Amino acid sequence: MITVALTLLALQPAFAQTAQSLPTIDLYVGMHRLQTEVASKPADRATGLMWRKSMPDNQAMLFIFNSYALHCFWMRNTFIPLSIAFLRDDGSIVNIEHMQPQQETSHCPAEPVRYALEVNQGWFDNRNVSPPMKVRGLPN
C-alpha cells in the first residue's frame, strides 16, 4: 500500500499537467480578450496552474467558488509568475496581487469574493488594468 501511495505521489506532477482538461470561456477586460480556463470544482481549484512551465500571453484561469469568502492563494508547485485579480459578482476588480513562483505567501482579496482570475504576471499592468475596472463575461 505504501508503494502505491509513493508511486502516485511521484507521478503527481506529470499527471497534474496532463490530466486537467477544463472548460474554457472568453473573458474581456476593456478591449482585451482572455481565453480562460474555468476551475469551478474543488480538485480543479486546488491544482490551478500548478506544474505548468508556461502560459500563452492572452490565456488565464478563472477560479469560481460556491461561497463568498477571503479565498487566499499561494504558489506552491507553480513555476510561472502570476498576477491575480479578485472579482466581485459584477466583474469589478477588488484588488490585484502579484505572485512569485514557488512561494507560499498568501495572497488574499480585500473583501469576500467568489471569483479570482490568474494571468501571467504583468498582464494587468501592461494593459493599465486596475480596480475597479470590470471583467466581462463571468459565468453565473
Locate predicted features:
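Compact, glycine-rich, soluble single-domain proteins
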Residues: 17-140
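Bacterial N-terminal signal peptides
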Residues: 1-12
